Amino acid sequence: MSKPMDVEQEPKIDDALYSRQLYALSHETMKKITSTSVLVVGLQGLGIEIVKDLSLAGVKSVTLYDKELVEIKDLSSQFYFSPEQVGKVGRADACFQKVVDLNNYVRIDVHNGELSDEFLKKFNVVVLANQPLALQLKVNEFCHANKIHFISVETRGVFGQLFNDFGEQFTITDTNGENPNAYMISSISQDKEGIVTVVEEQKLQLLDGDLVTFKEVNGMSALNDLPPQKIKTISPLTFSIGDTTNLPPYTSGGYVTEVKQPKVVDFKPLKNILESGENIFITDDFKFTQPTNLLAGFQAIHKFAEKNKHMPRPHNKEDANAVIEIAKGLLKKPDDELDEKMITQLSFGAQGDIVPMQAILGGITAQEVLKACSGKFTPIHQLAFFDSVECLPEDLETLPEEEFQPIGSRYDGQIITFGKTLQNKIENLNYFLVGAGAIGCEMLKNFAMMGLGAGPKGLVHVTDMDTIEKSNLNRQFLFRSSDIQQLKSQTAANAVRVMNPDLNVKAYSLRVGPDTESHYNEEFFNSLDGVCNALDNVEARLYMDSQCVYYGKPLLESGTLGTKGNTQVVVPHLTESYSSSRDPPEKGIPVCTLHNFPNAIEHTIQWARDTFEGLFKNNADNVNSYLTNPAYVQSLKTQNPFVRLETLASIKASLMDRPLDFNQCIAWARLKFEEYFNNNIEQLLYNFPKDMVTTTGTPFWSGPKRAPTPLKFDVENPLHLEFIVAAANLRAFNYGIKAETNIEVIQKQAANVIVPDFTPKKVKIQTSENEPAPSSNTQQAGGDAEDDQCDTILSQLPQPSEMAGYKINSIQFEKDDDTNHHIDFITATSNLRATNYAISPADKHKTKGIAGKIIPALVTTTAVVAGFVCIELIKVIQNKALEKYKSTFMNLGIPFFGFVEPIAAPKNKIREGWTWTLWDRFDVDGDITLKEFLDLFEKKHGLDISMLSCKVTLLYALFTDKKTKEERLKMKISQLYETLSKKPLPKDKKYLLLEICCNDTETGDDVDVPSVRYKYN
């Protein structure tokens, strides 16, 4: 059985589909991936996770091999099986069609013959999932001898192991996937050391022995032609390249760029590793005995299974003791001690099958397959163990065996691992999933397999306001091409109902925020057991975090960036919240650098993006506001005069110089070329000539400042023409003029445009970030001249009534449509400006990534992160102690896994014996007068309130005059709020959140206290 497809010699990569993956991997890596054939043996939950991720990643072909009939227990984690297939259909055949539907570019086959040597030779990579050890050893021996990359992986309850054998002399072409470090040079000494100093804004991230190349160095220009040079680091800003005494002295400019070196690694067969205990990859630095014990433990359960024809029985102490005895004989060193508790846990759950572990091990394995076929990133070398014992029931050993026995349910794999009691709790949970994108799809799949919300009292709410785009299909696996433009939340909900028809799921398309609190109200939040964020923006994350703190709900938080991922669990009254610790804001590009002194392609791309926004969106929006909003002109008076003049001038130009046909759009584009890439550069050089020196005698054009060169328009230059084509077509769209894509027509018309000669102006140009911009000088001076010019323009503008119904089409930037000229314009504009400043240009792909702020994304990372989130969810359900929870920081590329205990909620002291955290508050139940409120806090809590507020409304203060104070003391808090805020209290809410400033009545000291939740309704 197979899916037919046309196989080309070099497969064409669908940039629109693989867009986010390409930013994590590169086109070169994708070419290798799309030429790779993979065999996956074992199609239960672990195997299907690997297959799903590889299919979405776009390998050439995946062959499925598993002739065993579907069992009911498989449905614990195999999301492409149905109850109707149990006992009737082979596993590979049962999931074939649904795997086919994942990606039209990937060939899917089912093999129902034998795993013969000739058959295995067809594949670049062979993966064995949850297979007997004897088969692992046999297939690995053949693969190693025949240079076929081999991976075996298995999960047993909360335990997992993964083994890689990529053969001898395996070449890693890129160990970490990061862009090579590049630095701007400040100076190079002419001596024996040859010390290179980079500009101060940067910090070296180079190590001794790294190789670097030079370019654009002036003076010591011979460095530009040298092969990669080995360096020795000296300080955070300097390194040595050796003797430069025979080279001319350095004068200016130049970049130094890290050269990535390939790394060659040898892999040994599985038999050797099991015998020697070598090449164990550590996954958790705090679990010192885990590798020793699980190396023996996994072999022991396989030996037990080989002898008894079944894995150890669930929670069976007799079987566990037998496994312990086998494991003792497998310890490598005389002083090794067996952790009998760990081996018992492994034996108890050896038949366990939980979707979080399948997601984690499956995602990691799929990433290892991609490493094997591409050489991109560092593989696990060679044997790795994983466990999540912290999520097992605390009293596991003392619970009765009956609690863990299968009941003929689709959740049997989970019951074997955690017991029936916990399974019942999971099914009756109410959870709110915020976001149905990549992580959201994985979470919904995990919820469906776990049965979360599938019980009579259970429910999953999911919201996402976005619709499905083609680029989503590569990693948001619940969507198909037929779903494009459909709502994500509803489509995802429909998809997981197919996976588990018992799942109770409600889909919404409302964003979360203050404006939707009438929907996501107190009743809604009070009905929840917890919230899971699957968001891609900090603002929404912070909002949901604040709501979870207010309502006292657990929050599961996560994020990904390429191969990197992180998770955080927020537990009421136990941990800090998401907003308690945040990353510093990203450093922006200084305005003067952007406008006048770019030195990197990122600067020119951002300038081009801003230019696009100004020309095709802001101008149109301003015109439309002028024509439709009577108060618009008045509102402009609040802006500084320089900005107001600029805005009015653009409105005048947009209305009075509006094009009537496409030829006029071409003429406008040609004049814009002259303005941006010739006149503005001529003006800059007029103000700051190339030979200019500063007051200290150093050249003005040095360090990060690169002297630009004006461009002379050449109608035969493809880049010049690309700008004209894109700019003219966007201008035409603004004005509703029919587009033109005939290059010859545009070329001919552009060549005939009459362009005025450049005349320099007397203007001040900002030269550093610390220097005030010209516009702020104007504002400080009063801006009288600008005011007069504004009045003149206003008198010349047509009245809105004269142009009733007229509108300019505003263009909203859309990065993922290759036909709309948006990225074409930004790429051409950026590269022309880069040419001005002798900066290496960027292709469309790189430009799109930077201009569109595209976050690199991989389905493998997403799957692993969602798995780790669900492990924490299982702990939350059991109310685990703080030390049992883990925040995860990982990078599948290096690879690295870090697990740390969440930070406890900080305690604030009011007085001896009385502390509070962000989770605490005062509760006042019932609407009372201000006097009663003040008395309550004085008598009950010993707090003398000096100030009371609600949001921005001050309700009470000690300094209020006596008469006003007496009037307010008699008023109820609700009445007081409505009177002072001039807003009615919402009828659908019950509470106000009040803030108080107060003193301790015993000591008179100011004290910090929690908020007050005041029930008025």
UniProtKB/Swiss-Prot annotation:
Residues 765-788 are annotated as: Disordered. It catalyses: ATP + ubiquitin + [E1 ubiquitin-activating enzyme]-L-cysteine = AMP + diphosphate + S-ubiquitinyl-[E1 ubiquitin-activating enzyme]-L-cysteine. PROSITE patterns: UBIQUITIN_ACTIVAT_1, UBIQUITIN_ACTIVAT_2. Residues 765-781 have a biased composition (Polar residues). One of its GO terms (cellular component) is centrosome. GO terms for molecular function: ATP binding; ubiquitin activating enzyme activity. ATP binds at residues 438, 464, 475, 488, 536-537. The active site is at 592 (glycyl thioester intermediate). GO terms for biological process: DNA damage response; protein ubiquitination; ubiquitin-dependent protein catabolic process. SMART domains: UBA_e1_C. Sequence repeats lie at residues 26-163, 419-571. Signal peptide: none annotated. Monomer. There are two active sites within the E1 molecule, allowing it to accommodate two ubiquitin moieties at a time, with a new ubiquitin forming an adenylate intermediate as the previous one is transferred to the thiol site. Catalyzes the first step in ubiquitin conjugation to mark cellular proteins for degradation through the ubiquitin-proteasome system. Activates ubiquitin by first adenylating its C-terminal glycine residue with ATP, and thereafter linking this residue to the side chain of a cysteine residue in E1, yielding a ubiquitin-E1 thioester and free AMP. This is Ubiquitin-like modifier-activating enzyme 1. The lineage of its organism: Eukaryota, Amoebozoa, Evosea, Eumycetozoa, Dictyostelia.
